Amino acid sequence: SLADRVIIGLSDRTDRAGATELAALLETLGRRAEIAETPPGVLHFKTGCGLIDENTILAVPELASCPQFAGLEVVLTPLGENPAANILRVRDTVLVGDRWRATRAMLTARGIDVRPLPTDQIARIDAGLSCMSLRW
């Protein structure tokens, strides 16, 4: 389950020193952190995966074998829809970019409450739903 931990993805913006410092800070708040490598071709760890529920991750194929996902169900984005992995879960609802029809259909078929939102404008700067949110 991801309910008891935070995954910190390394990237051009987050180096190991920063991730280690954040992990130490999270520990003072009673949260366990794990540092993950972001594979080449994935801009940021969180743009390549999103939480469907506490035990299920939507991920691009490049993150399918991420060690931090051990014990979780990993659902891969449909072919050609890698940006759809940048979902945002709010309680039991998953927000998905409205242009990712195959992903929306796949999640809906799993019984997930899916809300499509327009993301075309934010996608122009390589951003998605998680980039436009503040959450804990």
Residue ranges of each PLM-predicted region?
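Histidine/cysteine-enriched polar flanking segments
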Residues: 1-136
